[in-house]
């Protein structure tokens, strides 16, 4: 599952990962939508942007995901350079398989992160 507030970024990530043989279950532009569908079919990995519209950010979404699926794999892709420091403030992220990619990134970095998390 991919969560980013920019539809063109969702399309870019989806097309790239699909071209590498990954199946994208769904993509979302806001936190409310992904949380409504959280029980439908848990993905192998979540790709989440930090800055989101409305009232939740990516960390808050990830917390809800980890409450439901403690072993979920999460990649944050963000321009927010202090994200790792923010994650360290929440015990729920301790000993989890999480990666933080700081924008701008090359697309192959997403694939590298995904493969690294899946192999842990």
Place the predicted regions along the sequence by residue.
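Short amphipathic alpha-helix used as the core "switch/output" element in two-component signaling
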Residues: 59-70, 90-91
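Active-site residues of response regulator receiver
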Residues: 4, 49-51
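As written
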Residues: 88-99
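Acidic catalytic/metal-coordinating carboxylates
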Residues: 30, 56-61
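C-terminal output helix
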Residues: 102-118
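Hydrophobic/aromatic residues positioned on beta-strands within the core alpha/beta folds
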Residues: 77-79
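Two-component/phosphorelay signaling modules centered on CheY-like receiver
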Residues: 6-26
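Acidic, metal-coordinating helix/loop segments flanking the phosphotransfer/catalytic sites
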Residues: 14, 27-45, 53
